[in-house]
């Protein structure tokens, strides 16, 4: 069985990933599962560059196939903020409840049609032979007026999906994986792992 490391320590993200890649004949490990404690500086200028930096570094360290993602929220009215800084927005130790409240506050008085946003996910697959494949996907929506929903994590409770009439935190894991930015990107990279 092929071993694949997904370069994350985020258990919520790993749950989502295992759901989508679970039918592949691979042993899928998180950094924690693989016993890796690497502090990689993500200094790329795009989601793609950051994913590639992470995947390459862990692949070189382990000699295994490594998947890494960089994802975030782009809000059009805020010039695509928080963008590649989504995880570090307002500081890494700031809870998403506080981050979400701040974004809602920054959009106070902004009408629905100008609250457009997207979740973006870039996934890089680094292989021991030095090759790399990168994909990018997005999920379009808008920023809601309050947090809603218990499923998901991060900015999900404020990311409203008009066609579903709810936030991404109100979708089941199965529903979310069908339409999410990460789900789309994982399905796009899946063939590289067969």
In which residue ranges do the predicted regions lie?
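Anionic-ligand binding patches
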Residues: 2-5, 11-194
């Amino acid at each position: 069985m092929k071993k694949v490391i997904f370069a994350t320590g985020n258990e919520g993200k790993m749950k989502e990933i295992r759901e989508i890649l679970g039918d592949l004949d691979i042993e899928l490990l998180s950094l924690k599962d693989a016993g890796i404690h690497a502090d990689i500086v993500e200094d790329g200028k795009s989601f793609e560059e950051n994913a590639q930096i992470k995947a390459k570094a862990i692949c070189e360290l382990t000699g295994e196939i490594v998947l890494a993602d960089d994802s975030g929220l782009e809000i059009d009215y805020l010039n695509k903020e928080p963008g590649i800084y989504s995880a570090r927005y307002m500081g890494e130790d700031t809870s998403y409840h506080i981050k979400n409240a701040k974004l809602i506050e920054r959009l106070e008085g902004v009408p629905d049609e100008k609250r457009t946003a997207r979740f973006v996910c870039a996934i890089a697959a680094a292989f021991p032979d030095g090759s790399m494949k990168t994909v990018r996907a997005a999920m379009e929506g808008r920023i809601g007026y309050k947090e809603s929903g218990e499923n998901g994590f991060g900015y999900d409770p404020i990311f409203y999906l008009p066609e579903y009439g709810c936030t991404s935190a109100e979708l089941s894991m199965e529903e979310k994986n069908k339409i999410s930015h990460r789900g789309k990107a994982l399905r796009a990279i899946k063939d590289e792992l067969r």
